[in-house]
Amino acid sequence: MSYNVGNFSKYLPFNDNIDMIASMIKESEADVVALNEIDSLTQRLPYDELSLLTKALGGWQWHFGRAMPYQGGAYGEGCIVPGKVKILKRYTVALPQDEGAEPRAIAVIETDKYVIGASHLDHVSPVARLAQAKVVNAWAQENYFKCKKPVFYCGDMNASPESEVIETLRKSWDLLSETENTFSSRDPRVCIDYIFHYKMSAPVKKVSAHTMTEFHKGDVTQASDHLPVFVDVRL
């Protein structure tokens, strides 16, 4: 699953919303989740958000990819995986920043069976967004070319399916998720959230993919301004 959670406080109080999103993740039965717009111990949200979320999920593991300092803490991306998963490496890759744009990063968890990277490309500068996409491709090429494990890249690309940014990513990555609209959750008019598989890593079999619009234990129109995207694959 890939989900821009908007700091867990876009529309609802933080404590209520993080519990609801944890329930939604449980209901989805996702084995790994990439998350965008995460705060860590900021003035506006003085919580270690991923720590609280993974506790609510029953002891999952996490990595916070710090993109920039913010209000005394940090802001960035995250990946979470179940507690039983064997993690080999957790690290963060800085992405290029254009003038007037925010710093961005890739949060990476490498396990014994797969690699997951999460990022949130720039929303202000098309130049920065394209440069960031090229660095994402280079990161995969330099670290995971002919990798014997599948490598996944997920997140809010702030780019539509026909954009140069997505075309650039698709030179190195197969698009697994559907191109159904993901933003905004209350009036979805554009697809900007994606799940990719690196072409030069171990193959996977795509079973299904969909943008998630309904949960028994949560309301997507209250949880975030984005819709979560979900892909079921066999390794």
Language-model-derived ranges and their functions:
Residues 13-14, 38-114, 207-212:
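Structured beta-strand-rich core segments of catalytic domains in phosphoester-bond hydrolases
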Residues 7-11, 91-97, 120-129:
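Surface-exposed cleft-lining segments at the edges of enzyme active sites
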Residues 1-56, 69-73, 134, 225, ...:
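N-terminal, active-site-proximal structural segment of metallo-dependent hydrolase catalytic domains
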Residues 28-32, 58-61, 112-114, 147-150:
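Loop/turn elements at helix/coil->beta-strand transitions in domains of secreted/extracellular proteins
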Residues 2, 77-79, 90, 106-108, ...:
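Conserved hydrophobic/aromatic beta-strand scaffold that supports enzyme active sites
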Residues 3, 36, 119, 154-156:
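Active-site flanking residues adjacent to catalytic metal/cofactor-binding acidic residues
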Residues 7-9, 40-45, 70-72, 124-127, ...:
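Active-site environment of divalent metal-dependent phosphoester hydrolases
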Residues 127, 131, 141-152, 158-235:
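Metal-dependent phosphoester-hydrolase catalytic domains
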